[in-house]
Each structure stands twice: as C-alpha cells, then as structure tokens.
C-alpha cells in the first residue's frame, strides 16, 4: 500500500474522533520516526497508538504551560515588598489559589493514567481542552451524559481504554470498531453530567452492566467521544438468540434483531420456527436436500470447526490465515445496504456475514479492510413438480427403488425434466394387461419349490418349462444365453423377422390403403418365477422382480447429449441394471399422443406375427415421458452399446405384455455411461419414434455408414 494512502487513513481515523489535522501531523511524524515507518503498529486497533500519542502530547503541553504560569507567579510574589500589610497578603493568597484552580482546568478532560499503567491509554479525541478565554461547550449542547458511578478494578487495566458495553463470550480485547451500539440494563448506579456546568448528579434506578453481571467504569471523555457532546441514549434491545455453540460452549453463534424505526413490536420466532423456516429456505432457494441435513447441525459444525482452527492454529500457521473468521448477523450493514427493504419485508431473509475476528484487518499490510458484501437471495416460487424435482437431488426415485439414485449436473445449471417416477410400468387406460392366477397352469410354475430355485437340489418346473434358467447363482445372465441375445440384436444374418397379416402400426395410421408389415424382430425371453411359485422373494430366478441393486447416477453429459445414466461402481458382464418402466399404451393411444406432442416409445412387438394380435388392446407399447424410471435417461449408441434389452415374463404367460429389462453386454467400469441401441434405422421410416440426430460417436454408427454409402454411390455415378 502506498504511504500516502496510509497517511490518509490515519487522518480520516483521527477526524472521526474529532481531532484536528493540525494536531495529528506533528505527532504522526514523531511516531513514524519512532516506529521506523512501521504502519502495522501505528494502524493497530484503529490507530490507537496515534490517538494516545496526540492526547499525551496535549496533556504534557497543558502541564508545561501550567507550571510556567506558576513559576512566573512565584517570581512576582518574591518581588513584592515586605511591608505589604496582612490584608494585602491575604488578598494576594486568595488570588493565587484562584489562579491555581484555573490552571488545573487547562488540563484536558481525559481519563487519568493510573500508577504503573503504560503509555497506550486511550483518551477521547472528541472533547477539547477548555481554556479561560471562552467556553468550550456550546450552550445548546446541555443534554446530560449517563455514566457509571463506581471504581474500576486494577486488574482490568488492560481493558480500561476500551468501551465495552456488552459482553459476547468468549471474545476478549474487542476493538473500537466493533463496540455495540446498545447497552443492557444492570444494577449499578448512573451519573448525570450536565454539559453546561460540568455538574455531576446521581440518577437512581438507571444502570449499565455487562452481559455477565459485572460492571466496567467508563470515563466521561470516552463516552463523550462516541456521543460527540450529545445525549448517550441507553437503548434496551431484546436478548440475543443463541443459535449454535460448540460442545463445551467456547464458541457461540448469536442472532439479534433490530426492528425498523417506528415499527410495531415484532413476534420473535422460536428456535423451532426458525429451524423449519431455514430448512425450507435451503430446499427452495439453494436446491439442496439431504435427509441428514440440519441447519442447526450445520451451525454447530461451524462452531466446532472454528474451535479446532483456533486451538490448532499455532501448529498450522503456514497453512491457515492469521485472522480466523467467525459468523455473525450484521443488522446495521443491512440497514445501510440496498437490501434493507428486502430484509425488513420478510424476516426469513436473514443474511449471514463473515467478518474477521481482528476487525477485518488485512494480514499483509495491516490496513483496515472492508466487510464482505451481503447478498440477499430472492425466494423462488416453485411449482409442485419443480419442488418434487428439487427434493429428489439425493434420490431421483424418491425412495421408490431399493437404492438411492442421485442426479448431478457439473456442466451447467440445468435440472432434469419434470416427470413422475414409477418403479414399474402402469396401464394408461385401455391396455389389456390382466394378471390372474387362473391363467397360470400348474406346469408353468413351481408351487412345490421353497427357498432358492437355483439351488442344485431343486428340481424346479420353471427351469424345465423354459429350457433351463437364464441366470447363474451369482445373479448374472448365462454366458451362452447373453451371447445369443447380443447376436440376434446386432448381426442381421442371425435376425429373424416376424410379419403380421395386419400390422397394428399400419392400421393406426388410418390410411386408405393398408401397407404391408415391415417386420418385427423375434427375441429370446426370460421366464422368472412369479406369484404362483412357492420360492422366496430373493430366489435366484427373480432378478428383475428384486429391482435395482447397483449404484447408479443420473448426470448431465458434457458432450451435448443432454442427460444420461452412469454407474458409480464396476459392473460385471450379464448384470441386471434396470427395467424400462413407463405408461402401458395401446397403439391407438400412442398415435393419439404422438399427434399432440413428440414421444419416444418402445413397441412391445417381440411376439407380433407369431401370434394373432386380435384387438387394439393387445398391441402395446411403453412410453416414459411423463411416467417412468431412470431408463428414460439412458442414451442411444449404435451397435456396440454396453446394455441390451431382453423381454422378461414375471406376472403372466400372455406374450403380448412383458417387462423389458436391461443387462450389461460387457464389463463396465465405474463412472462409465450406460447406453443401449434404440434400434432406429435413421431414415424416413422411423415412425412412431421421434426423429433425432445420432451423436453416439460409435465407430459403427449407422448415420456414418449411410453417409459413407452415399458418397460411394456418387463416386460410382
């Protein structure tokens, strides 16, 4: 910092105390020479050393003038004639006494230094030194000053120069800049000083005390410095509310409230009301929700952390700043800021300011710093859906899955689209999905099984009815079964297409001429034990029914593909991830919805063509735009996706409805995005799926192949 700026700050600090620049300049020069221009020592405690030096010099000057005056009078007395009669001598002695009294008045009205006290005593800079030439106090300023009338203990000498009217434990050596504006009521007596004549009178019933019941003496000059020859009013404020503290009470966070001028008596909220309001504020404004989050717990952690830093600060001085911060509410700063109206309009918009324990002094150059800016966050008006979405940060399933599935956005400030989470698919309206025990034959279930059907000792009918189990004892897909499913999905040579006589998709278009069916891919399916089976819920043949058990996370992709799903742990090959859940729509219902807004449905056509799909209520699809689960966030990847969808029968033997479960096609590392092939050909015949531009980045991307084929055709032409 430039020296001229230090000098400017010193003059400004002295002006605030009522000291003229002419008195400051010579003393400041002497201090700079004495401290070898070390501004850090001079600027400490709001230039306290400079103020003391100014008053000491003024006091010495007054004493010196008084002594010189007395010496002159003594010389005059010695030169008087010896023959002066007794009457003249008495008159001369009375005049000498009067002059002594008048000389004593030349000393500045200042707190006298006690024996053994150092030269750093603090005096008032605002009260001048009255002289015999004229009055030093205007007649208009004759309001009384209230002062305590009791002695100061000798052991408090180190605090004698500080005006501390309230005690906030455990702070000591409070600087002048942080002196409270108000004083509490106590039991000590008050003195009234009439400024017009300096007379002191005791007023009964008015007291000044500290927070712990002890009293501190305050000199008239100290009070006069802060009152500037005006009435020092004692304002009674409500007691501070203790918000939090450390375990043993060394560190505390207190909250005080100063109502606006002229306002009615406010209702001071209780701790429970404040806690509920702040937790709701955190949910609405800061978009954080953790079941274990507590505002009071957070503040207690602040106190504990502050205590740890304060007690261990010496050992880690090179790592931590010298001035450790503490948290306090600054009502005065709010009144002076532009946020005053916002604060007074709603009491819940309290603002917490971080300030320094050493009155925000810059650690490097010793300059007095400014307090940090206050920010008032406006309260957001959220809809029910937005509130539900913000509440799902820790678990987007809202507890409907067996594990928590958080969501995170590390790219921008977007949030996931609003939807209703469902763990299993639900019928929208007309879909013929009926689960009944009467439709399950005895040879289609294992009612005689108990425990785990995958145990070697079990002779399960479900295994014989569907050519063995699809799962291993570890809950993974059989290697051979998984490879067959992957080959059917990726290798056109091994794909088998089934054709309908009257395709429900073509019928739903309601065109004059019905176009022929374009074919439906036949898929292998998994048959799990169901309600009529006698095995347990944790049977090895109930993998999909047991739900999600891996750690997954919804995240915003950095490559421009929007939201995606990734795993937080390593997944083996053949592991179940989740099922595709959504609204079960008939094809006519789906086409009606497509006409209103674009959708991305999945057609349940694994058995179309092999069986007669009679009736529109049996041609079904899944649509997860408004009702769905985490599968709606899985992005597309051509051909080499790490997930594959497989039909799973779990409630009924009817082939027109089944679950669509996702399994891993290979080993997947932690934090890797999960993808599956939508099966979209990316041409004009993608109906009813909404068209989109493929951004999978795969080496086998079908869009790249179409572009390369088009280039080859142009070259041949």
Curated annotation (Swiss-Prot):
Q: According to its UniProt record, where is this protein located?
A: Nucleus; Chromosome
SMART domains in UniProt: PreSET, SET
- Superkingdom as given in the UniProt entry: Eukaryota
Q: Where is the composition biased (Low complexity)?
A: 120-130
Instruction: Quote the record's binding site residues for Zn(2+) 3.
Output: 449, 529, 535, 539
UniProt xrefs under InterPro entries? Pre-SET_dom, SET_dom, SET_dom_sf, SUVR4/1/2, WIYLD_dom_sf, WIYLD_domain
Effect the entry attributes to changing residue 636 to A = No effect on its function in transcriptional gene silencing
Q: Name one GO biological process term.
A: gene silencing by siRNA-directed DNA methylation
Annotated binding of Zn(2+) 2, by residue: 445, 462, 529, 533
Instruction: Summarize where Zn(2+) 1 binds, as residue positions.
Output: 445-446, 449, 453
Annotated SET domain ranges read: 550-679
Q: PANTHER family, alphabetically?
A: INACTIVE HISTONE-LYSINE N-METHYLTRANSFERASE SUVR1-RELATED
Question: What's this protein's name?
Answer: Probable inactive histone-lysine N-methyltransferase SUVR2
Originating species: Arabidopsis thaliana (Mouse-ear cress)
């Amino acid at each position: 910092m430039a020296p001229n700026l230090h000098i400017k700050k010193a003059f400004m600090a002295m002006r605030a105390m009522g000291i003229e620049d002419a008195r400051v300049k010579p003393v400041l020069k002497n201090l700079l020479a004495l401290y070898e221009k070390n501004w850090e020592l001079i600027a400490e405690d709001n230039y306290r050393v400079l103020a003391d030096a100014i008053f000491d010099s003024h006091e010495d000057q007054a004493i010196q003038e008084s002594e010189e005056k007395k010496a002159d009078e003594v010389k005059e007395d010695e030169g008087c004639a010896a023959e002066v009669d007794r009457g003249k001598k008495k008159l001369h002695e009375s005049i000498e006494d009067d002059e002594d009294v008048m000389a004593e008045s030349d000393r500045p009205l200042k707190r006298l230094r006690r024996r053994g006290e150092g030269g750093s005593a603090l005096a008032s800079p605002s009260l001048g030194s009255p002289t015999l030439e004229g009055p030093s106090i205007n007649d208009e300023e004759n309001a009384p000053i209230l002062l305590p009338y009791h002695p100061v203990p000798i052991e408090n000498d180190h605090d004698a120069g500080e005006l501390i009217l309230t005690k906030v434990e455990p702070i000591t050596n409070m600087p002048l800049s942080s002196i409270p504006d108000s004083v509490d009521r106590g039991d000590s007596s008050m003195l009234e000083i009439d400024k017009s004549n300096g007379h002191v009178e005791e007023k009964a019933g008015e007291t000044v005390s500290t927070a712990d019941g002890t009293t501190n003496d305050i000199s008239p000059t100290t009070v006069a410095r802060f009152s500037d020859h005006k009435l020092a009013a004692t304002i009674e404020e409500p007691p501070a509310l203790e918000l939090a503290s450390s375990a043993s009470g060394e560190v505390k966070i207190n909250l005080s409230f100063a109502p606006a001028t002229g306002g009615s008596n406010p209702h001071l909220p209780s701790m429970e009301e404040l806690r509920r309001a702040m937790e709701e504020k955190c949910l609405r404004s800061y978009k954080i929700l953790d079941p274990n989050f507590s505002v009071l717990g957070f503040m207690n952690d602040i106190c504990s952390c502050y205590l740890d830093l304060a007690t261990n600060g010496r050992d880690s001085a090179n790592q931590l700043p010298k001035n450790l911060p503490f948290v306090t509410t600054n009502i005065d700063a709010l009144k002076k800021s532009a946020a005053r109206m916002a604060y007074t309009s709603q009491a819940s918009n309290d603002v917490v300011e971080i300030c320094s324990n050493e009155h925000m002094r810059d650690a490097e150059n010793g300059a007095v710093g400014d307090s940090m800016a206050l920010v008032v966050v406006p309260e957001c008006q959220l809809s029910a859906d937005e509130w539900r979405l913000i509440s799902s940060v820790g678990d987007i399933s809202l507890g409907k899955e067996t594990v928590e599935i958080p969501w995170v956005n590390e790219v921008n400030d977007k949030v996931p689209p609003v939807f209703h989470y469902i763990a299993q698919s639900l019928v929208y309206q007309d879909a013929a999905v009926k689960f009944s025990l009467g439709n399950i034959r005895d040879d289609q279930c294992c009612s005689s099984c108990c425990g785990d059907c995958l145990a070697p000792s079990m002779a399960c009918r479900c295994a014989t009815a569907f050519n063995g189990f699809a799962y291993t004892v570890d809950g993974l897909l059989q290697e051979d079964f998984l490879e067959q499913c992957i080959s059917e999905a990726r290798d056109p040579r091994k794909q088998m297409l089934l054709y309908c006589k009257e395709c429900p998709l073509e019928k739903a278009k309601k065109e004059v001429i019905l176009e022929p069916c374009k074919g439906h891919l036949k898929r292998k399916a998994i048959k799990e034990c169901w309600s009529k089976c006698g095995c347990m819920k944790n049977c090895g043949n109930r993998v999909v029914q047991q739900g999600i058990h891996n750690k997954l996370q919804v995240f915003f992709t950095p490559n421009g593909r929007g939201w995606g799903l990734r795993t937080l742990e390593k997944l083996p090959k053949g592991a179940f991830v989740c099922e595709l859940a959504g609204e079960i729509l008939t094809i006519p219902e789906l086409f009606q919805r497509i006409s209103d807004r674009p959708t991305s449905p999945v057609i349940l056509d694994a058995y179309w063509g092999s069986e007669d799909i009679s009736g529109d209520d049996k041609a079904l699809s899944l649509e997860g735009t408004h009702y769905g689960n985490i599968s709606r966030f899985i992005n597309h990847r051509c051909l080499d996706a790490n997930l594959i969808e497989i039909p799973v029968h779990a409630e009924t033997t009817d082939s027109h409805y089944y679950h669509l479960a996702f399994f891993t096609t290979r080993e997947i590392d932690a934090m890797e995005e999960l993808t599956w092939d939508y099966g979209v050909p990316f041409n004009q015949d993608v109906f009813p799926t909404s068209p989109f531009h493929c951004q999978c980045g795969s080496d086998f991307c079908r869009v790249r192949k179409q572009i390369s084929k088009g280039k080859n055709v142009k070259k041949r032409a």
